[in-house]
């Protein structure tokens, strides 16, 4: 089976400004946000703490764009899953320009994190094709967070019933000999 590659971006960061929303001729919403992610480390030579911030352009489409425009504000913390896209455009002087963005389409996810800052969505709102939570390799969803996925219809979360175990419960009250 031939591999086509993987193009997936996961970001957790804070908005640098309020979302910019516009509408396409077909009525679909498009929201542009800038997301800051920061990394901290201690400089081995000086012992001083250093920090580097990266700014990411993120484009949300459809219902996700509408949700972002209504609930996200400058400083909001958000979890994003999308794809990298580079697009070409021509500036006013006729020069070709390129920009790389994280595009969040139907298969992507936007989840608001943190508390309700100045009135956010009610806790537990879930729109679209959210995936079951938990398991290895999947992001842990904070309690009370609001997850919005790009699916067109709302699906209830389904959890698998716990498999019965034949093992006795673990007893942690034993004395440890060391």
From Swiss-Prot:
GO biological process, one term: recombinational repair
Single GO cellular component term: single-stranded DNA-binding protein complex
Disulphide connectivity of cysteines: none
Known outcome of mutating residue 56 to Y: In SSB-1; destabilizes the tetramer
Start-end of Gly residues biased regions: 115-137
Region (Disordered): 113-178
Motif Important for interaction with partner proteins per UniProt: ranges: 173-178
Cross-referenced CDD domains: SSB_OBF
Domain SSB: 6-111
Coiled-coil segments on the chain, per record: none
This protein's record includes keyword DNA-binding: yes
Post-translational modification (record): Phosphorylated on tyrosine residue(s).
Gene3D superfamilies per UniProt: Nucleic acid-binding proteins (2.40.50.140)
Record keywords: DNA damage, DNA recombination, DNA repair, DNA replication, DNA-binding, Phosphoprotein
Biological role stated in the UniProt entry: Plays an important role in DNA replication, recombination and repair. Binds to ssDNA and to an array of partner proteins to recruit them to their sites of action during DNA metabolism. Acts as a sliding platform that migrates on DNA via reptation. SSB or its 10 C-terminal amino acids stimulates the ATPase activity of RadD.
PANTHER family referenced in this protein's UniProt entry, alphabetically: SINGLE-STRANDED DNA-BINDING PROTEIN
Oligomeric and partner information: Homotetramer. Interacts, via its C-terminus, with many proteins involved in DNA metabolism such as DnaG, HolC, PriA, PriB, PriC, RecO, RecQ and SbcB. Interacts with RadD.
HAMAP family according to UniProt: SSB
Protein name from the UniProt record: Single-stranded DNA-binding protein
Gene source species: Escherichia coli (strain K12)
Lineage of the organism: Bacteria, Pseudomonadati, Pseudomonadota, Gammaproteobacteria, Enterobacterales
